[in-house]
């Protein structure tokens, strides 16, 4: 998983992460994205560049809500996990995931569940094995899913 910038129709042109200097970015305070953006702001400060304006959004807003808002031009710049941005870009045609503007290094995510749950482990592992690595797509087309 990589944290990437997502833009839309109201977004400014961004050629590199440095172009985020002085820009407004909407983010939830509790998210890992906030930490990554704060780290980038410290770098900007050290380089004598203007910091990004980190505008906090309500904690009730999910990444999907914010991507929808970017798509209709209510928000200009957000940060989302790459897999989620790519998945939703297929549904929200006006958002633009920007893997070229990555705020984090690749990392892994995993499921955690109670020890001694063999049925849950089997179900989760079977489902995980049906998805191609590093994608949100099934390894083989699933009838009726349109994938």
Language model features: what each stretch is:
Residues 1-147:
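Proline/Glycine/Serine-rich low-complexity intrinsically disordered segments
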């Amino acid at each position: 998983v990589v944290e990437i910038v997502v833009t839309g129709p109201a977004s400014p042109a961004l050629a590199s992460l440095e172009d985020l200097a002085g820009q407004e970015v909407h983010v939830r305070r509790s998210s890992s994205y906030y930490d990554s953006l704060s780290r980038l702001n410290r770098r900007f400060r050290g380089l004598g560049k203007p910091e990004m304006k980190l505008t906090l959004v309500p904690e009730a807003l999910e990444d999907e809500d914010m991507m929808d808002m970017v798509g209709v031009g209510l928000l200009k710049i957000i940060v989302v996990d790459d897999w989620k941005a790519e998945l939703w870009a297929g549904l929200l045609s006006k958002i633009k995931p920007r893997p070229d503007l990555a705020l984090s290094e690749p990392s892994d995510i995993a499921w955690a569940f109670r020890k001694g749950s063999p049925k849950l482990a089997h179900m989760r592992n079977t489902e995980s094995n049906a998805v191609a690595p590093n994608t949100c797509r099934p390894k083989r087309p699933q009838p009726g899913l349109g994938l």
